[in-house]
Amino acid sequence: MVEGADERRRVGRLVLAGLPIGNLEDAPPRLLHALREARVIAAEDTRRLRQFASRADVRLGGESGARVVSYYDANESRRGDELLADLRRGEEVLVVTDAGMPGVSDPGYRLAAACAEEGIPVTAIPGPSAVTTALVVSGLPTDRFCFEGFPPRKGLRSYLEELAGERRTMVFFESPHRIAATLEAMATAFGTDRRAAVCRELTKTFEEVRRGGLAELAEWASEGVRGEISVVVEGARPRAESTSDTDLIAAVGALEDEGVRRKEAIVRVAKETGVPKRRVYDLVHGVVEAE
């Protein structure tokens, strides 16, 4: 039993800490204390971490100093193995990103999963997140939501069509040079009047939240949008009880009679009824039987 206790004491601990997403005053005291006490810090961008520490008047690692290493998408696998080795030797490893919580659209979850598998303790110092911040200021339902990260550059249309029937509020990240095209694609896939909010520069001096239908927002964004951007989109409306499987098939057929291609007709019916596109597709093509 003594050997087991000694072994447990030699195991390190992984600490995932959230940094402010724009406002230095959002840095919690626990974060500043952890940065001063840390011996090993894995940062998405070491230069930006040192800039943050300087602004916050924090000496990384205190008098003894900390070993600060980079930990980002390109080196996540290799660096993760190195950090795991540190943890096995009993080191406490502090992981931070440029802004927000590690593991949320940033490296962290794979290392946390590896630690959990090996029985290495994992804890967090909660901090700001652009995901939940955008959600709560959007004015859209917050009881059920999903985070989609950055939409893919390739296959955007099919990706969004698959999400057309998602009933939960959706949160996305997007870059300034792609936001207008993405909103336009969302308007096509989800419907021009689907409510959304574009949240820009959250917690910063020029914070802005623009609300409206997707088509309206796409037109606004076409004039140019700058800064860090989060997009919140309301979920699909629940399927009306009167919309039976037979009604869905008939609706697609009616659109085809009007000259609409079947693929587009399926997308439209799914969008209008809130039924997942895959379900409408399977019904129309006889993959599943109508109920």
Predicted features by range, described:
Residues 2-7, 11, 67, 91-92, ...:
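A contiguous loop/helix-start segment that scaffolds small-molecule binding in enzyme catalytic cores
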